[in-house]
Amino acid sequence: MKIAFIGAGSIGFTRRLLADILSVKELQNVEIAFTDINPRNLDMVTQLCQRDIDSNGLSIKILSTLDRREAFRGAKYVISCVRIGMLEAFTKDIEVPLRYGVDQCVGDTLCAGGIMYAQRDIAAFRDFCKDIREVADPNCLLLNYSNPCAMVTWYCNTYGKVKTVGLCHGVQGGHHLIAKALGYEQKDIDIICAGINHMTWYISVKHNGEDLNYKLLDALKADPDIARTEKVRIDMMKHFGYFSTESNGHLSEYVPWYRKHTENIHKYIDLGVWINGETGGYLRVCTEGRNWFETDFPNWLKEPPYEYKEEKRSGEHGGRIIEALETGRVYRGHFNVINDGAITNLPDDCVVEVPGYVDKNGISIPKVGDLPLGCAACCMSNVSVQRLAVHAALEGDITLLRQAMLLDPLVGAACEPDAIYQMTDELLIEEAEWLPQYAQEIERAKARIEKAKADGTFIPPIVTQGAARLHTKTVEEMMLDREAAKNNAQEADKAKKRT
């Protein structure tokens, strides 16, 4: 059996997820393939992971290749952790909208950054899915960790014709936070979540069968750390009655209220940790983390290798799903799948995040029923944008792309329509190398920008670093505190629990 990783150069995540898989005795003789477009990152992650494998006494030899089809050939599972455009495109996702007053913390799920990320991803996943269909195992399952998770998963299932499950750790992180607030161990709190990726709602929170949702808001407010760092999530629960899975910074981007006035952003965020709302926080951490890893890599090779043990596995779903499908050991988690009636008051064709069970028979999704109306309405505001963005990406349809931007909750709150049109043109121009489906529209966008500058209708950019921007440290600055630099770099690791 073969498992292929695409975007394997996502070093911390690939290494941790591989350890999760190879900690399962029945999976210790699988074939492993890594592929990436960055040869240096691919080489570094291969060195680290092969050393881990060897130190655990396994005979696996990683196939490390720049040839995607070679990696996919015969694979029963493909795990995606790609970032199309890498940090160069990510920087544009944050900086261009900021010139129009759109202040993002993460920018990888919705808002202007998430919409553009989907345009790049879908252009690339068109080829990925084609390769999977042509050379992978006929029953290959794509486990997608790439953001924007919902839109990529929507495309791959519906248009790429590859069975795909989107995976995220937001549910697990919020579960930990809820247990902490209520004064219990996480294992003693039973939760059910339903919604859409990064806006999933804890619709059931129980301890020994007792519903504790009525206690949760007061418990969250009473915890000094949570009250300081999760102001948006607490305020959303006050208005909608249920706690949301995603972090303060993430959630602040998916609704129109918390980031539209730059002078008020500090009221709702905390700068202690990037994910609590810092302007461009995830970009800063990813940039510092990449630069630090490239500098500090020789020291990583001197550290003890990972031990492949059950008790050291992470909370990520990927390894558990493969284990359940291959061994029959039942796994319960929350997964991103085509709705198909699971949540009855969201569209059947959208991607929802809901409970699921996995065993040798496959992945089974129970019927959740209706979400509370207010929660469903919040989700629908995002689903409508996702639908427009996915369809825009299919053929490079600028009309649908503009409409996605117009209807995005934060973009629409921060900008007038003319500014949104101009911002969209600038994003297309600056990200042209990753958007082949927009080639003709990009030339038209250039002409519109030139005409606007010539006739005086060009909207001048806002000169700002954002309402809550922190300095991106140089390698030299990070070297002054190596331990802090390493810890900060790990904040960009998808496998790290952030609560």
Per-region residue spans from a language model:
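Internal, well-ordered domain-core segments that constitute the primary functional module
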Residues: 127-206
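Long, compositionally biased stretches enriched for glycine and/or charged residues
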Residues: 183-496
